[in-house]
Amino acid sequence: MSYRHTQRGTLVLVTMGICALVMIVILIFTSIVIGTTALVVCLLLMIMFGSLTVAVDNRAIEIEFGIGWIHREIPLENVDSAEVIKTRWFYGWGIRLTPKGWMWNTSGFDAVQLNYQNGKHFIIGSDDATALAETINQAKMG
């Protein structure tokens, strides 16, 4: 059994795209150093957080932002169950510490909450939350 899904971070891409355009204008009319630095930061943020890919196989859940510089592997043996949840708007996007535990999310409010055997939780934002939770729970059963 395997699952792989990539969600585009529309809000991140649009916001950073607008930021990049503004930085290009600043670059044209002001200091090259300030404009170039800000433009590079915007482009790096787009590359790093513009998407979230989740893959599940029979041993682990792999999560990576963008091109994979930021990634995490969660062994299935540590997960008790997975359930579909809605995140609160103030949890935001990106990598966040929420009242329910750490959350990785690039867009939207649909998510899967991993319930660890030690009682802690980890939240994965997904526009395919139902299929992701079902896949994780099926992989846990063997």
What are the roles of these predicted feature ranges?
Residues 1-29, 103, 109-111, 121, ...:
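N-terminal membrane-targeting/pre-transmembrane regions
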Residues 44-60, 64-65:
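Transmembrane-cytosolic junction motif
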